[in-house]
């Protein structure tokens, strides 16, 4: 919404504006009263275990021409297969869902997203995963919250920072994580809405905000003509050619419409 509003201003068009103060917690509570209990942190990552001593996060972009149906499901299946190529273990992906569709007509600049979760099993097909996501959305699982979601805003930043650093060390030592990764698909960008007299959009992408306590974060965007896949991950999980290998696996495995 906010990017489209900027281009309305650049084109000299009337602005729509927004006075919404809705948060993702408020949005979730508005349509789902059930909560969820977190499973044990026992999930493996798509590129094996942490190696080396280099800290920090690295990101790369994969540009692919054409249109791709069921893109989230395709990516989830490929990432799961990659994880099992390194070791046996449980694989679960969080999929970011924009909850704005729960309130049609809402105009907000907030990040009104929550996660649904895909528990991957060997033999699951893209169609299986697609049906699972559709059923979870029908059940309104995108509004289910963990108890910690309600409390984290009250945790002092210093305490939160220390907890995150401790978790990074633990997860990278054990090779077992809260999730195998996060997959986000904001959808196709509209060149018409994101262009003006002096700028014509050809493609666009989002750099996913990965943390070192998470094996991988993938964000996908693009237009009707192409898809952009952005991958971010810890340097300890990307080194040794593993990130490049995963990108090659995605490039070869994704099937266009």
Annotate each PLM feature.
Residues 78-79, 246:
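Short, hydrophobic/aromatic alpha-helical segments in well-folded domains
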Residues 1-63, 249, 253-257:
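Non-catalytic, low-complexity flexible loops and terminal extensions
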Residues 59-61, 84-257:
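Acyl-thioester-dependent acyl-group transfer interface
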